[in-house]
Amino acid sequence: ALDATVHGTKAKLETHPGNHRIGFWVNAADFVQWKFNFPRAGNYDVELTYSAAGPSGTKAVITLAGQSLPVTLKTTGSWYRYTTLPVGRIKIPKTGPHVITVKCTKKIGGAVMNLKAVTLRPR
C-alpha cells in the first residue's frame, strides 16, 4: 500500500505501525494504482490482501497489461482482520513498466475494503 497512488475523494493511505493500507474507501469511484517495473515477462499469479467488515458481495477488478481479473469480496468480519484471496493469473507480455489498477465495480454496504496489497508471484 505504501507505494500506491490513490485517486478519488475519500480513499487514502493509512500508515499505522505494521499495518499500512488504503482505507476510508467509501466512494466506489475511487481507485488505486501502482507503477511497477517487471523484470521478466511471463505468467504471474495475482493475490489481493484486504479486510472488509461489511457484507459480502462487493465486486472489484484488477487490471494490468490490458487484462482484467474480476474479484468478489467476502467479509472478513473486521477492518483489522485481513485475508489473502487468490484472484487469477495475468500474462505480462514484456519486461518493463506496467500499471496495476484496482477499481470497485459494485459496492455493497458502506465501504469497499481496506486494501493492504496486490501480490504478483511468477509462475
Protein language model features and the residues they cover:
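Extracytoplasmic
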Residues: 1-123
